[in-house]
Swiss-Prot record:
This is ESX secretion system protein YueC. GO terms for cellular component: plasma membrane. It comes from Bacillus subtilis (strain 168). It is found in: Cell membrane. Keywords: Cell membrane, Membrane, Transmembrane, Transmembrane helix. The lineage of its organism: Bacteria, Bacillati, Bacillota, Bacilli, Bacillales.
């Protein structure tokens, strides 16, 4: 019954009053006052106040530190050999990276390893496929024979 009333709009509609007077909004034009004086006169929008004495004494200059030179000398070194960088240590030890690293001269060992590894994977696949086929060949007749005995 409820679903039937949903499809009929007159049954679901609420009763409303017929004589509802709705008055439209009336727009009355009002004059807009735009103050453009601040565009022409700087003194109009600037607030004139005098700075207090405490703010007059404030400076933005960094005070000179007497120990700055000593600290700078501690953490900087002009001698490159005393430096603890990788470049300085490799220079002290006589290690250069300009030469190419030594490689194996015989490539037959790597070829043999590649051949055995390339043959090993297909052999594993063949063995797995043969085991799967053998399992299917032997198991399916046994299962069908057991079903025939039950029937």
């Amino acid at each position: 019954m409820l679903s039937f009333s949903l499809f009929i709009p007159s049954a679901a509609a609420a009763q409303t009053e017929e004589n509802t007077d709705v008055a439209p909004n009336q727009y009355e034009k009002k004059d807009i006052e735009i103050d453009t004086n601040y565009l022409h006169e700087d003194t109009y929008y600037e607030e004139k106040t005098e700075l207090p004495e405490e703010q007059k004494d404030i400076t933005f200059d960094k005070p000179k530190d007497k120990d700055a030179e000593l600290i700078k000398d501690l953490f900087t070194s002009t001698n490159a050999e005393d430096s603890n960088t990788i470049a300085a240590q490799s220079k002290q030890l006589g290690i250069t990276f300009a030469e190419k690293p030594m490689t194996k001269t015989s490539s037959t060992e790597t070829e043999d390893e590649q051949e055995t590894s390339s043959l090993l994977l297909p052999m594993i696949y063949v063995v797995l496929i043969l085991l799967g086929i053998a399992g299917i060949v032997f198991l399916i007749p046994k299962v069908t024979a057991q079903e025939n005995k039950k029937a």
